[in-house]
Amino acid sequence: MKKQRIVVKIGSSSLTNSKGSIDEAKIREHVQAISVLKKAGHEMILITSGAVAAGFSSLGYPSRPVTIKGKQAAAAVGQTLLMQQYMNQFKQYSLTPGQILLTRNDFSKRERYRNAYATIMELLERGVIPIINENDSTSVEELTFGDNDMLSALVSGLIHADQLMILTDINGLYDANPNENPEAKRFDYLPEITPELLGYAGSAGSKVGTGGMKSKLLATQTALSLGVKVFIGTGSGEQKLADILDGRGDGTYIGDKELSSVNNTRQWIQFHSPISGEIIIDAGAEEAMIHNGSSLLPAGVVGVNGSFPKGAVVEVRGPGGVIGKGQTHYSSEEIMEAKGKRSDELDFEKTFEVIHRNDWVNVKD
């Protein structure tokens, strides 16, 4: 089997005991399974929850705190304890982990987005196992990922992973709640995530985590759109990840084998960039951009809403509504000066595209 880049996401419920505290035996087993694939030549990246679960009891909380300040305090203590556990376990296999804590700003700010990519790739190049978690001790409620399921999908896309393995306490996706309906049927394979499947999943999560099955499916949708196949399920023993990789996992495999990776510029535009304004285009430009993959030229621009600098990301609206978003080559003032004009009517420096097709993401097909 060729070397693969694999992201493993482990949720709180797969790391904790019945009291909600970190279970050292569970961490040991996860590390063993990761080490098996690492020793086989694969690149391994771990997205781990558990900082809050690891720290809340040390602060005197009887259970997982629900307030932001409580979670942040627990995470500040717990992240150190959690990382110490991982370091001790990986040391048994002569492997070195490296900690990366991310927030929304690390994705929405273009330079930080590039830096996150460069750091992870350097760690992989050096044979280190990146251990990634949201920076729960500094994130504010409005800026959090909501759960590490989505973080795992975004990281998988960022580094162009071959597969995302989401480990949970349920062995895959069912057409009904298996805890309530003994007739519930498991899906062993799904080509995609549909609205109907999201309805099956519901929204409830476990008492120690923040992500239910629905959040995992939303993350899966994102991963698939970025060209990453997904497995959702469970397993036991040091061979569990190897079994998943070989198609023998206890869960649901999601995604077509022919998925195409998405370059980082388009990923950033599609999922992370702030929207600074809007460009209005005519029907001809709409047709060319949606169906022909064309760049946006000044001749197709009708108007501009908002004030924005060169390099801003804006939505593009045609007669049929918003058709996508892209990064502009000119400021709003320059676009207004050039709108509706043919190339031979413009100064030389303004004959280039308003939005190049490589800096463009369709939201309509």
From Swiss-Prot:
Species of the source: Bacillus subtilis (strain 168)
Gene: proB
The family this protein is said to belong to: Belongs to the glutamate 5-kinase family.
One example of a Gene Ontology biological process annotation: L-proline biosynthetic process
Pathway: Amino-acid biosynthesis; L-proline biosynthesis; L-glutamate 5-semialdehyde from L-glutamate: step 1/2
Binding site for substrate: 49, 136, 148
Enzyme class: transferase
Keywords assigned by UniProt, alphabetized: Amino-acid biosynthesis, ATP-binding, Cytoplasm, Kinase, Nucleotide-binding, Proline biosynthesis, Transferase
Binding of ATP, residues: 9, 168-169, 210-216
Job description of the protein: Catalyzes the transfer of a phosphate group to glutamate to form L-glutamate 5-phosphate.
Protein name: Glutamate 5-kinase 1
GO cellular component terms listed in the entry, alphabetical order: cytosol
GO molecular function, one term: RNA binding
Substrates-to-products reaction catalysed: L-glutamate + ATP = L-glutamyl 5-phosphate + ADP
Enzyme nomenclature, EC number: 2.7.2.11
